[in-house]
């Protein structure tokens, strides 16, 4: 794989640019470089907006990996919101992989599981709220009911509340989504009419904590004076939020690095599995009533967030211009000429290749990837080398000209329009810090552009076909009067300009009426075709 002799680890997750996924990938890539492994990160964007056809197109990515050739697998299943995605990936891995498998943050039978020790730090969070701040009325927002971390953290909450002799009723526990979409529902539940106001809301991860805090502020509550809030995971975004969110920091980078070490250690015994637990570290901050101990770090993070926001605004504007500029393209070669101008908006990229299915212009329905792929557009070491026509075996993932004997670290995402798969794009980044900055907007623009090119070229073929229908006789295929006028006049003008002679013959077929009357129109048509053959033979 990747045209070199190194072992390759496949990483499967969703939304690689999100903070947990990004830090995990940084750890994986750092660990892989240390021992000389390749890494292929397969990352889709999920079912945003509940667009089922787009989601189907995005899911084609899970059919791209050459599972049988992977030397190790790292799974971040809890990043995949849709059950069908998780089941699809797990099925392919169980049936086709013969290598060590590592599952991050989720217990998976038959895999090495790298898990967070939820008990120790969640207990510490609850102890902090009760002992340090004297709170008794606590609510808990956990994750989905079927999620292992959500179950463990909820059990810990209940156990500690029992230890302190504190009650917890129905409206003190809410099942969230481990994302930002349930803040309003959670607050409606915790603050339901007739229920006593909570002193603190403990959330099972940081995304839900910031969603709850935002909703409380919107409703006029002060944090922490009225209601304290805490999260879990230690996302950097908790430092940029005002007030800074109390949390527990999980070492995602180290989890990624350790995953690589386990894969390397178990190359000869992939069937032997283990569970490894990582401790989280309590970070008391402003949202529970403590002063942030990381004062300088807070200022640094907020400055970075400000800079990132400015960069993001500029990138969004550039992508708008990109969409306008790319709409002028009618061929893939024209895209290659212009794409180099905008790809620098993908932070820290080094190499890029667009890999399209054979016959992608003729696709009419969803069929997935072809065994042979073509790379029409490529950027190598930040230099545009398009147009190219490199054909390669899909199992290698990229053409040989884009690889080397150095460890390869590629991120791959499918290129599609709705459920119509055109191929995929692959990016390699300069270093681990900028790893994984895939942009959904970029991907959508390219997918829509390929659809526009396909539609344009099909329309052009249709126009030519219609012109042929209007200009030629349907029976013989020879030019009719309209065709004679459209093509004859230019020929006369050319002969006149070049001083050349031109031959014009008008042929009338005698006896046509008698053939039709006596033998039928089928025989008449046959006679016309024979005359056409004679003319073509004389004037090929």
Feature map (PLM): residue ranges:
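Short hydrophobic/glycine-rich mini-motifs in sensory/regulatory modules
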Residues: 415-425, 436
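Bacterial carbohydrate/catabolite-sensing allosteric modules
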Residues: 1-321
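Short regulatory alpha-helical coupling segments
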Residues: 467-468, 481-501, 530-539
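A short, aliphatic-rich beta-strand micro-motif
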Residues: 400, 406-416
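Amphipathic HAMP/coiled-coil signal-transducing linker helices
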Residues: 37, 321-325, 460-481, 490-493
């Amino acid at each position: 794989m990747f045209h070199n002799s190194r072992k390759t680890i496949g990483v499967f997750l969703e939304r690689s640019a999100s903070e947990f996924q990004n830090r995990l990938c940084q750890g994986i890539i750092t660990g892989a470089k240390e021992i000389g492994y390749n890494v292929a990160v397969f990352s889709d964007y999920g079912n945003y907006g509940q667009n089922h056809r787009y989601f189907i197109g995005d899911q084609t990515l899970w059919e791209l990996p050459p599972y049988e050739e992977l030397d190790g697998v790292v799974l971040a299943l809890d990043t995949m919101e849709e059950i069908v995605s998780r089941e699809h990936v797990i099925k392919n891995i169980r049936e086709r992989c013969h290598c060590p498998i590592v599952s991050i943050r989720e217990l998976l039978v038959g895999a090495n599981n790298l898990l967070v020790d939820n008990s120790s730090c969640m207990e510490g969070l609850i102890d902090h709220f009760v002992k340090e701040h004297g709170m008794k009325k606590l609510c808990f927002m956990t994750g989905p009911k079927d999620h292992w971390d959500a179950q463990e953290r909820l059990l810990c909450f209940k156990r500690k509340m029992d230890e302190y002799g504190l009650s917890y009723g129905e409206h003190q526990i809410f099942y969230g989504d481990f994302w930002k979409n349930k803040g309003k529902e959670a607050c409606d539940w915790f603050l339901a009419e007739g229920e006593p106001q909570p002193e603190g809301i403990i959330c099972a991860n940081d995304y839900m904590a910031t969603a709850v805090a935002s909703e409380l502020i919107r409703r006029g509550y002060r944090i922490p004076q009225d209601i304290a809030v805490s999260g879990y995971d230690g996302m950097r975004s908790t430092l940029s939020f005002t007030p800074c969110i109390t949390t527990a920091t999980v070492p995602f980078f180290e989890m990624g690095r350790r995953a690589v070490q386990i894969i390397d250690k178990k190359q000869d015994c992939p069937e032997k599995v283990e569970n490894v637990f990582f401790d989280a570290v309590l970070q008391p901050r402003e949202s529970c009533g403590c002063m942030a101990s990381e004062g300088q770090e807070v200022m640094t993070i907020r400055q970075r967030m400000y800079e990132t926001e400015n960069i993001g605004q500029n990138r969004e504007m550039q992508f708008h211009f990109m969409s306008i500029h790319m709409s002028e393209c009618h061929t893939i070669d024209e895209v290659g000429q212009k794409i180099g101008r905008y790809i620098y908006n993908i932070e820290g990229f080094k190499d890029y290749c667009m890999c399209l299915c054979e016959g992608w212009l003729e696709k009419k329905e969803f069929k997935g990837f072809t065994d042979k792929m073509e790379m029409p557009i490529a950027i190598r070491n930040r230099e545009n080398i398009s147009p190219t026509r490199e054909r390669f075996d899909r199992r290698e993932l990229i053409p040989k000209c884009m690889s080397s004997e150095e460890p390869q670290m590629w991120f791959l995402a499918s290129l599609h329009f709705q459920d119509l798969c055109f191929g995929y794009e692959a990016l390699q980044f300069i270093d681990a810090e900028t790893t994984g900055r895939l942009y959904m907007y970029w991907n959508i623009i390219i997918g829509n552009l390929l659809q526009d090119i396909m539609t344009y070229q099909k329309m052009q073929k249709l126009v030519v076909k219609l012109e042929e229908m209007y200009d030629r006789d349907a029976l013989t295929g020879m030019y009719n009067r309209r065709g004679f006028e459209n093509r004859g006049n230019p020929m006369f003008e050319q002969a006149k300009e070049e001083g050349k002679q031109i031959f014009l013959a008008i042929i009338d077929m005698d006896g046509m009426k008698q053939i039709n009357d006596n033998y039928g129109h089928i025989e008449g048509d046959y006679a016309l075709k024979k005359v056409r053959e004679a003319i073509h033979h004389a004037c090929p």
